[in-house]
Amino acid sequence: KTETEGHVTRLEKVFAAIDKRPQGKTCDAIVGIADEGAEIMKEYKGSPALDAGLLAAAQAVEHYEISRYGTLKTWANELGLSDAAGLLDQTLAEEKKTDAALTEIAESVVNVEAEAA
């Protein structure tokens, strides 16, 4: 099972816990970050800065997800929905771990290569 599939499964459990049906919705913030990534690909095509720019866009997605899951976890705790808060916390921890891994890649390889070019 992929990490994303785990996130979906946990979200389905959160919705079941609050007796609501999940609905898909386009997230304008993520669309904006994706558009930014597309601009980076055009502007820096063939450049060592391309990887650094794409990594920055990927981290922007992670930071948005961390913000959303953190907020949802806080709300769940405030509403006394400890099971939902626990599920959201698991996903939040995974998002933070991914962000830390991206930071490590950026600092140890990608940004160094872009700067040296």
Which residue stretches match the model-derived regions?
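Amphipathic alpha-helical hairpins
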Residues: K1-A117
